[in-house]
Amino acid sequence: MTSDLSSKHCESCEGIGAALNSEQIKNLLPQLNTKWEVTEDNRIIKRAFSFKNFYETMAFVNAIAWIANIENHHPDLEVGYNYCHVHFMTHALNGLTHNDFICAAKIDKLLVD
């Protein structure tokens, strides 16, 4: 599940280099909650979260917004009454970077499964 990734901070996307390759992604994924998935094209990590009501959902979304602001790395969110789907990719590189895994690990720490 979560590892020391959650204690790291994101790098600026300017000059970050190349997107992670399949092997790097394969090594980082086990450091996240097992509910995170990688898309077949290795460009996105995603996870679905469920809640009891709209209030809990929005509290979670606001916590994600706070993390995203602090790290200056922002996910794509799909939000409904009792769910939030989180998708991370580094848009500047059209793929995954350590930043995506760092933010996912920080989100994992928000909830106890």
UniProtKB/Swiss-Prot annotation:
Entry keywords, A to Z: Lyase
Enzyme Commission number(s) from the entry: 4.2.1.96
GO biological process: tetrahydrobiopterin biosynthetic process
InterPro entries linked: PCD_sf (IPR036428), Pterin_deHydtase (IPR001533)
Keyword Lyase (UniProt): yes
Catalytic reactions on record: (4aS,6R)-4a-hydroxy-L-erythro-5,6,7,8-tetrahydrobiopterin = (6R)-L-erythro-6,7-dihydrobiopterin + H2O
Protein name listed in UniProt: Putative pterin-4-alpha-carbinolamine dehydratase
